[in-house]
Amino acid sequence: MTHSPDLKGSSFTLSVLHLSDNEIAKTVEFLQEKVSQAPSFFASAPLVINIAKVEGDIDFTALKQGIADAGFIPVGVTGCKDKRVQNLASEAGFAIMSASKSPTQAPAKMAPTKIVRTPVRSGQQIYAKDGDLVVLAHVSAGAEVIADGSIHIHGTLRGRAIAGASGQQEARIICHDLQAELVSIAGDYWLSDQIESEYWQKKVMISKAEESLHLETLTI
C-alpha cells in the first residue's frame, strides 16, 4: 500500500528581526555579531524580517543575501505597508507573512516532567518535549537545555536554556545561579551581555510578558 504526501497546517516559533531603517550593512553586522556570540543557537537559524517601522524602500535582494551571508536562513517578510512593498519582497525571493491570530486548537497535552539528575556537559542537548524540564545539577557552558514547558535548574546555568520552545508564553526559567550564555522563552531571548549585572550569579526566575523577558530574584 502506497501513501501519498499529506499537507497539514502547523505552527513554529521563529526568530523575528525587527528593522528600524533600511541600512543593510548595519543589519548584517548586527546579525554577524549575534552569530559570533552564540553560534550553535543562531547558525542556520530561520529568520523572519519585520519591516513595519522602516521608512523608504529596502533593497530586498541585498537584505536576503546579507542575512544568508551572516549565517541565517531568510524565511520571509512581515509588516509590509502596501502591495508594492510586498511585490518587491516577493521578487527578491521572500515569502510574505502575517502575524498569526491566537491559536484556536486545544493546547497539546503536557507530558510528565523530565528529570535530569546528572550535570549537563558542554556539547550535550536535553529536550523535554511537551513538558517541563528539571535539572538537579549544573548546566555547563556549551550545553543546551530545551523544554516546551518550563525549565528548573537546581544548580548553575552556564549554558543555554530555551523554555516554551513550542510557543508557550507562560513558560518560566528558574535557576539557582544565573551565568547563562543565552536564555529564551517562546522565541524571545537574551544573550549573556543583555542580562543585568544585578541578576548575575543570583537565584532567579525568568518569565515573559508583553513580548519581552522579565527577571526577578528569588529568596527561597
Swiss-Prot record:
GO biological process assignments: cell morphogenesis; division septum assembly; regulation of cell division; regulation of cell septum assembly
Q: Which UniProt keywords apply?
A: Cell cycle, Cell division, Septation
Source organism, top-level taxon: Bacteria
SUPFAM superfamilies per the UniProt record, alphabetical: Cell-division inhibitor MinC, C-terminal domain
Q: Name one Pfam family in it.
A: MinC_C
Q: Which InterPro entries match?
A: CAP/MinC_C, MinC, MinC_C_sf, MinC_N, Septum_form_inhib_MinC_C
Q: What does this protein do?
A: Cell division inhibitor that blocks the formation of polar Z ring septums. Rapidly oscillates between the poles of the cell to destabilize FtsZ filaments that have formed before they mature into polar Z rings. Prevents FtsZ polymerization.
Q: Which HAMAP family match?
A: MinC
Subunit relationships: Interacts with MinD and FtsZ.
Family affiliation:
Belongs to the MinC family.
Task: List the protein's name.
Answer: Probable septum site-determining protein MinC
Q: Which species is listed as the source?
A: Vibrio campbellii (strain ATCC BAA-1116)
